[in-house]
Amino acid sequence: NYRASFGFMDHNTIVKVNDYRNLVVKLDATQKAFDGRLVGDFGVYGYSSKIHDIFDTRMLFYSAAAQNLTYPAGTDVNGNWVKNSAASHINHPGALLYEKNDSEERNFNTHLGLKFNILDNLILSAFGSYSYSSTGNAQFCPTWVWAQGNVYRGEFKGEDYFTNVSLSYNNAWGDSHLDAVVGAEYLKQVRTGLWVQAKGITTNDFSYNNIGATSSRPFGGTSSSYEDPSLASIMGSVTY
């Protein structure tokens, strides 16, 4: 038995510079062998998304509502945006559209399960899976709306390893019934992270793609993380 599915979505919002894209792929297969005594199940799943989101929804739409429509849509001869002086602390909506709040996410998972009937009442089961995830975030605020500008890049990754093996026995005779199970399980997770925040940009042309051109790093804005917890367990039960 083989199954495959595929999905793709391209979502364009009312704000032309913002959009969302999602891609999903899934494959599954089930196979029997040795006259059905061995059953194998295999699956692969992949997901990818790209999101170009609004940095501050409330600020953007309030700015659009408060903007004087007689003002130019772009910058003046000096490269500055003309603001509505009657609206306090409100930037030109055109300048706010240069803000970026982008993210990318990728997920991958695969698993394999086996079930083998050694005897009619003795079953060996095994299952293993691997998962990988990656999330990237990137933000940019130009100097028109943020003093000295603001740039942020972050990437976070995760891996999960899981395996399970069990042996079960089931038998009945007369008025008696016996169930016995013994199993072992292991789980390991790895998490890594790296993020950088910077200010003091001299030009808005590079967006978040040239952090090296910035002049300052806020305290605590640059760091990394790593952790790798694991868990192993053994269990058994007998019911008579």
Protein language model features and the residues they cover:
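Long hydrophobic segments that form regular secondary structure
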Residues: K115-D120, V238
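Transmembrane beta-strand segments that form the barrel wall of outer-membrane beta-barrel proteins
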Residues: F6-D10
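Short, contiguous hydrophobic alpha-helices characteristic of membrane insertion segments
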Residues: Y2, G236-Y240
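Surface-exposed loop/interface segments of Gram-negative outer-membrane beta-barrel transport/assembly proteins
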Residues: N1, T13-N18, V24-N107, S125-S233
